[in-house]
């Protein structure tokens, strides 16, 4: 049921905006099982995270921070983000906090 509620939240937040791709950043079961319906409802690609298939550890803090900085924060500020933990947010809201995250460490 959690996945179903998340789909509704994403679809509501998207509204009438055009979505080209919805990126799943990890392969938790609730994300994987709802991906086909999310793709259909948004009329968008929903690529799933392949796991640690590239030989690097996704729990490695510098890798995670680098990915957030270089890939996510390169997106437009109004880009919606749904982490699956708490309310949705935007890139513009979260980007100013990167230094705090780095200082806090993992």
UniProtKB/Swiss-Prot annotation:
Gene3D superfamilies: Ribonuclease Z/Hydroxyacylglutathione hydrolase-like. SUPFAM superfamilies: Metallo-hydrolase/oxidoreductase (SSF56281). It comes from the Bacteria. This is Uncharacterized 11.5 kDa protein in thcD 3'region. It comes from Rhodococcus erythropolis.
């Amino acid at each position: 049921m959690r996945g179903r509620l998340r789909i509704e939240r994403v679809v509501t937040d998207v509204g009438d905006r055009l979505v080209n791709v919805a990126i799943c950043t990890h392969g938790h079961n609730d994300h994987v099982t709802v991906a086909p319906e999310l793709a259909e409802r948004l009329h968008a690609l929903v690529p799933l995270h392949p796991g640690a298939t590239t030989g690097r550890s996704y729990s490695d803090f510098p890798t995670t921070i680098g990915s957030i900085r270089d890939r996510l924060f390169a997106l437009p500020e109004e880009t919606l983000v749904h982490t699956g933990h708490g309310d949705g947010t935007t890139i513009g809201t979260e980007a100013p906090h990167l230094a705090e995250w780095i200082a806090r460490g993992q």
